[in-house]
């Protein structure tokens, strides 16, 4: 009897291993014989993965992610161009978008006024239980478990080496399996100016008091130009913001004192083009893809004026961040007053983002301004340093060196 059970068990195990081997052999053969994976995508699926039109050529890698799960971490292993990557992901202690974050849509009505409406509040799909990170590799991921597979969406690396990881649409999971992911570059930059009058609003009691812990509460507004890139999907937009702002938050985790943790207490997403009037009115009428970024900030003083809290029901925030996919006339990728957090009429920041996390560094830079940090060059610090024999950029440098792959606080 024991011999029969042992023989049956060995046979079952052999058949199981053979089925797994056969499955992966079919997938490998499928990849070899079919056209490029991105050419398998429909236009809708292409936009879901890359946040761009399928007419654009994307330089990407199609990679099989292997996951080893231990009690304390997820080890994610993959290879790109013969280089092995090892990420040690641990569950985030908190999410920048906590449960209960108020999400509202904005719409421009025929009365030329912006009106606000409740949308579904945040839920477990982008909470801390689904956010994993590797601080050493500057990696942050939103994980989604599907049967025996885990889908990874997020970013890793810094500077010119920052990459986006995108999971497969459901249809392609049935072809390739969910372990395969698209990986491509997220090219971002930083270029801003100190706003006129910024020196007069430097500092506040909170930023100068030597706190041990600081929790900047942000109201994030997604302009329609970015919302369109995110396929006009509220769920996709919130997932994107969860990854984006967790990536920004990670840059502040290098601070020992004070400890800085970002909390998003509100999100506004527009339903039509002109809903965020402070952005729309700053666009160049002869070329609506261009904008005067400085006007976004000056227009914000009126948009977030006396009636905003009453009409929108947003009043629990220290600063606003408006994200848009527009090209500034002077090439600025972000703007904020120095030391203006918690200061009405000046606590508004702008960041350019193209839907591929290109604005992460700029967002950290502008939040640094709000928290009273000057440009490094303005206070006698270099914008680049040799760190461990490697040329390294600083987050608060006025201009970014696009050849730098690592950024630190000076």
Swiss-Prot record:
GO terms for molecular function: metal ion binding; metalloendopeptidase activity; toxin activity. This is Venom metalloproteinase 2. The N-terminal section (alone) shows no toxic effect when injected into the host. This section may function in stabilizing the catalytic part of the protein, or in directing it to specific target sites of action. GO terms for biological process: membrane protein ectodomain proteolysis. Its main location: secreted. Keywords: Glycoprotein, Hydrolase, Metal-binding, Metalloprotease, Protease, Secreted, Signal, Toxin, Zinc, Zymogen. InterPro entries: MetalloPept_cat_dom_sf, Peptidase_M12B.
